[in-house]
Curated annotation (Swiss-Prot):
One of its GO terms (molecular function) is small GTPase binding. Gene3D superfamilies: Leucine-rich Repeat Variant (1.25.10.10). PROSITE patterns: IMPORTIN_B_NT. Functions in nuclear protein import as nuclear transport receptor. Serves as receptor for nuclear localization signals (NLS) in cargo substrates. Is thought to mediate docking of the importin/substrate complex to the nuclear pore complex (NPC) through binding to nucleoporin and the complex is subsequently translocated through the pore by an energy requiring, Ran-dependent mechanism. At the nucleoplasmic side of the NPC, Ran binds to the importin, the importin/substrate complex dissociates and importin is re-exported from the nucleus to the cytoplasm where GTP hydrolysis releases Ran. InterPro entries: ARM-like (IPR011989), ARM-type_fold (IPR016024), Exportin-1/Importin-b-like (IPR013598), Importin-beta_N (IPR001494), Importin_beta-like_NTR (IPR051345), Importin_rep_1 (IPR040709), Importin_rep_2 (IPR040944), Importin_rep_3 (IPR040520). The keyword Cytoplasm applies. Interacts with UBC9, RAN, RBM8A, eIF-1A and PAX6. It is found in: Cytoplasm; Nucleus. Coiled coil: none annotated. Residues 45-111 form the Importin N-terminal domain. HEAT repeats lie at residues 24-54, 56-88, 95-135, 142-179, 194-231, 236-268, 276-325, 330-372, 375-438, 440-476, 487-522, 524-558, 562-600, 603-648, 676-716, 720-754, 761-803, 815-845, 860-893, 897-931. This is Importin-13. GO terms for biological process: protein import into nucleus.
């Protein structure tokens, strides 16, 4: 509790001896905390004050700090210290002092009833904590006693002050309960006790709220107190009178916010749905607010409309199932639904003119789920009633999704535009969900409206209306399979008729085409209707994201039908790339689109297109390779390498991706001869080496080079084989000069794909031995500066053991050094590195029997590994990593049982190891548990979690309740 040697001096004491926890020193430290301009001094003071609050002396100085002659800041600290002592150190208080402590707190609260409100609140919180710790046995009628004591007439404080102090105390009591650190069994007892005690609270609150003489401040406090108590899951029928009083209080503008909060909290209790009769009584009360709601909307009173909407939604959303079940009351519930519809369609643009409509969206999900969960017969009845409601909802949502006029939108802040974007996404999600209720009729409905809008000659249509209807289509088509819809051909036919005069409309047209790309793949004759629009949009930088992402979707989904358009697509793409119209990320997407496109062409066509597409970049790269390195040409190099790697990511002439997706047999025959990507890579290999020679010490450039090959390897798989020898050689030279994590990651890919093939084993083995040797040297020099390299190295070793354990049979591999370095890596502070090291050991230990050098090193150095694992569990590693260390223990037990049974007993015999908090019995129990469990990995993880809590002194604390 009290550790004097660690206390920093207060009040500028600096390195002076630690100060005693006296009233004077606390006051000096508080002065320093509030008024010293030096931030270090403030931090020292704060640390010292926290220690002071935890010290035994806090019981003494807290009361003195509450004296009337002290300023509120000092009194507040005294009250806070009392709360901390009571809530966190309750076990230190002798039982014979409970009553005197209670009496002192009552006295102080009475005194501060007419004093500082912040101090009063802290004292009330302290007394609330005391009550919770004493209930129900040591203080069985705590709440009734509080009410009785504060109603006593002999108090020196005026009745209003006493009343407000009592209400503050009653308000913080449930709040303190919600945040208290009571053990679970105590929490349950106290909750039951409080639920009984609400009988002493609610009549008082009703009386104060309903009597005309109660001042506004008292009635507001009553509502807050009620709001606090209902969160204890008080039966809704017991709250009926107070809820009705709160509804009446909604007419008072000063009480409006508190009334809303109280009503919403009462209605939203999880248990409230059991009290259907009370819920039915609430519907007329909510419907009775409609005039007030309409008046608020008319007057632009956003706060009032927002509050009333919260109440309606709370009732509808939390209890739709219970209210739907009351078939004889269907009309009143439908009226509530229509009231919520009014809130959804509240006039004005979100979030500038209104912030209410967004509250209602989840209600429509809930109502639909509840309707669709009924048995077929009942569902059919409700569908008849609510399908028209949901069609109306679609109209309302699409109206709300409309952009404002260009002029108005121009005045919106970037934050308002972002909120509106998110709001539209929420509307999109709702529309997609509503499709489940309305089905294909919804698409027909949208199509008819769009058709009428675009073909009407009576009046010019607004682009906003068109955009919203398209947005509705897009929302549904993005996630629902519309391939069998009979309206999509008509929609594709309508799109070219849209007069696009606005960026937002153009964006939505693009995204709608993108959402229909799978449909276009099944109806390729329609591609020509929309492709020209997409290619035209590519030239507009304002449509960068929508046009490029749409082209990428079309090239991915429709690639086998695009050869007739390939030349045009490549030409337009080349043009926009050369003009640098798009940002880097969109350029990368465009290259991926072209990769998909080229994959479906004949090899000669691919090579011809590749040549025209990348020649300008190769020439630029040749020029850059001659220049002296500087920041601007580095950016250009990384950009060009990025373009190439993104192109090669998707250029797959063997159609591996189609194999994964189980595509129809529309793909082209697998071409004979070298892969076009390999041809290009071989042509530019010397150039890439030249670039590397100048930029070897730049991680970004090395990463970009490795990315080209890594993405190519992942896409080409076995087709990459001709490149393996020269790439292994280049990687070896790179890594020998300056080790980089990206080179190890690429080596891991090569090991994964090619190490098991005899033809490629020699170059891969040579590379593996080389990078291992270089990395081991790095360990000797100080690996702590390179956690990323160590992480990648551990992943490489694990992959080697998984794919080709023979790599560990080579005499030139120092398995012992590798093992020791991996043990060292277990002690790194970086979690990913530790995880990777654990992953290596869980791959290594099962190989003890089959790979002789591995078995030998485990026998010789396995004890060292166990010690490191136990140290980590003992407290040296983050608790979040315990599952990884448990995996090592499980592997040791499963594959090296006889060794582990000796090592673990020897290791745990050492005094204070792995933690001074452990008893010999606890250590013995742990070792026996571990040695017994060789099958159930989950059980071992549970044992390790429990043991690490014991080691850290956290076992059984609330702090670890969710661990």
């Amino acid at each position: 509790m009290e550790r004097r040697e660690e206390q920093p001096g207060a009040a500028g004491a600096g390195a002076a001896p630690a100060l005693d926890f006296t009233v004077e020193n606390v006051e000096k430290a508080l002065h320093q905390l509030y008024y010293d301009p030096n931030i270090e001094n403030k931090n020292l003071a704060q640390k010292w004050l926290m220690q002071a609050q935890a010290s035994p002396q806090a019981w003494h100085f807290s009361w003195q700090l509450l004296q009337p002659d002290k300023v509120p800041e000092i009194q507040y600290f005294g009250a806070s210290a009392l709360h901390i002592k009571i809530s966190r150190y309750w076990s230190d208080i002798p039982t014979d002092q409970y009553e005197s402590l209670k009496a002192q707190l009552f006295t102080q609260i009475t005194r501060f009833a007419s004093g500082s409100k912040i101090v009063l609140t802290r004292l009330c919180v302290a007394l609330a904590s005391l009550a919770l710790s004493m209930m129900p046995d040591a203080w069985p009628c705590a709440v009734a006693d509080m009410v009785r004591l504060f109603q006593a007439e002999d108090s020196p404080v005026d009745s209003q002050g006493r009343c407000l102090a009592l209400l503050e105390l009653l308000t913080v009591l449930p709040e303190e309960f919600q945040t208290s650190r009571l053990p679970q069994y105590r929490k349950s007892l106290v909750r039951t006790s409080l639920a009984v005690e609400c009988g002493a609270v609610f009549p008082l609150l009703e009386q104060l709220l309903q009597q005309p003489s109660s001042p506004s401040c008292v009635r507001q406090k009553v509502l807050k107190c009620f709001s606090s108590w209902v969160q204890l899951e008080v039966p809704l029928q017991d709250c009926e009178a107070l809820i009705q009083a709160a509804f009446a209080a909604l007419q008072d503008s000063e009480l409006f916010d508190s009334s809303v909060e109280a009503i919403v909290n009462a209605i939203s209790q999880p248990d409230a749905q059991r009290y259907v009769n009370t819920l039915l009584k609430l519907i007329p009360l909510v419907l009775g607010l409609q005039d007030q709601l309409r008046q608020a909307v008319q007057n632009g009173d956003m706060e009032t409309s927002h509050g009333i909407c919260r109440i309606a939604v709370a009732l509808g959303e939390n209890h739709s199932r219970a209210l739907l079940d009351q078939v004889e009351h269907w009309q009143s519930f439908l009226a509530l639904v229509n009231m919520i519809m009014f809130c959804t369609g509240i006039p004005g643009h979100f979030p500038v003119n209104e912030t209410t409509s967004s509250l209602t969206l989840t209600f429509w999900y809930t109502l639909q789920d509840d309707i669709l969960s009924f048995e077929a017969e009942k569902q059919a009845v409700y569908q008849q009633v609510y399908r028209p409601v949901y069609f109306q909802l679609v109209d309302v949502l699409l109206h709300k999704a409309q952009f404002p006029s260009d002029e108005e939108y121009g005045f919106w802040s970037s934050d308002e535009k972002e909120q509106f974007r998110i709001y539209r996404v929420d509307i999109s999600d709702t529309l997609m969900y509503v499709y489940e209720m309305l089905g294909a009729e919804l698409l027909s409905n949208l199509y008819d409206k769009l058709g009428r809008l675009l073909t009407s000659s009576e009046e010019p249509y607004s682009w906003q209306h068109t955009e919203a209807l398209l947005y509705g289509f897009q929302s549904i088509a993005e996630t629902i399979d519309v391939n069998y819809s009979d309206v999509v051909p008509g929609l594709i036919g309508l799109i070219p008729r849209i007069s696009i005069s606005n960026v937002q409309l153009a964006d939505t047209v693009m995204f709608t085409i993108g959402a229909l790309s799978e449909w276009l793949a099944d109806h390729p004759v329609m591609i020509n209707s929309v492709l020209p629009l997409v290619l035209h949009a590519l030239g507009n930088p304002e449509l960068s994201i929508s046009s490029v992402s749409t082209l990428k979707k079309i090239c991915r989904e429709c690639k086998y039908d695009l050869p007739p358009y390939a030349a045009n697509i490549v030409a337009v793409s080349q043009d926009v790339l050369m003009k640098q119209i798009h940002k880097t990320s969109q350029c990368m997407w465009l290259m991926q689109a072209l990769g998909f496109l080229l994959s479906a062409l004949q090899v000669e066509e691919i090579l011809k297109n590749l040549h025209s597409l990348i020649s300008p970049y190769i020439q630029q790269l040749e020029k850059l390779a001659e220049e002296i390195p500087n920041p601007s040409n580095k950016l250009a190099i990384v950009h060009i390498l990025g373009l190439l790697s993104n192109l090669f990511t998707t250029l797959d002439v063997s159609h591996h991706e189609d194999d994964h997706e189980g595509s129809e047999l529309r793909k082209l025959p697998v071409p004979q001869g070298p892969n076009p990507v390999v041809v290009v890579l071989q042509q530019v290999f010397q150039l890439i080496q030249k670039v590397l020679s100048k930029w070897l010490n730049d991680a970004q450039v090395v990463e970009a080079v490795c990315a080209i090959f890594e993405k190519s390897v992942k896409t080409l798989l076995d087709d990459f084989a001709p490149m393996v020898p020269q790439l292994c050689e280049m990687l070896g030279r790179m890594y020998s000069t300056i080790p980089q994590a990206s080179a190890l990651d690429l080596t891991r890919q090569l090991v994964h794909i090619f190490a098991h093939e005899p033809a490629h084993f020699p170059p891969i083995e040579a590379l593996f031995l080389l990078v291992t040797s270089v990395t081991l040297t790095l360990f000797q020099q100080g690996p702590r500066d390179h956690p990323d390299i160590v992480d990648s190295f551990m992943q490489l070793l694990a992959q080697a053991l998984k794919r080709k354990p023979d790599l560990f049979l080579c005499e030139r591999l120092d398995v012992k050094a590798v093992f020791q370095c991996a043990v060292l890596a277990l002690k790194f502070p970086e979690a990913p590195t530790v995880k990777a090291s654990c992953g290596f050991f869980t791959e290594l230990l099962p190989r003890c029997g089959e790979v002789e050098p591995v078995g030998k090193v485990v026998q010789e150095d396995g004890r060292m590994l166990l010690i490191a694992v136990l140290e980590a569990i003992g407290g040296q590693a983050s608790r979040s990593l315990m599952d990884c260390f448990a995996d090592i223990l499980f592997a040791l037990n499963k594959h090296c049982f006889s060794l582990l049974s000796v090592w673990i007993k020897e290791a745990l015999q050492a005094p204070g190891f792995p933690s001074a908090r452990l008893s010999p019995e606890q250590k013995d129990t742990f070792s026996q548990q571990i040695l017994r469990e060789r099958v159930n990995k989950r059980r071992v993880k549970e044992m390790v979690k429990e043991f690490t809590l014991l080691c850290r002194g956290l076992h059984g604390t609330d702090y670890t309740a969710d661990y």
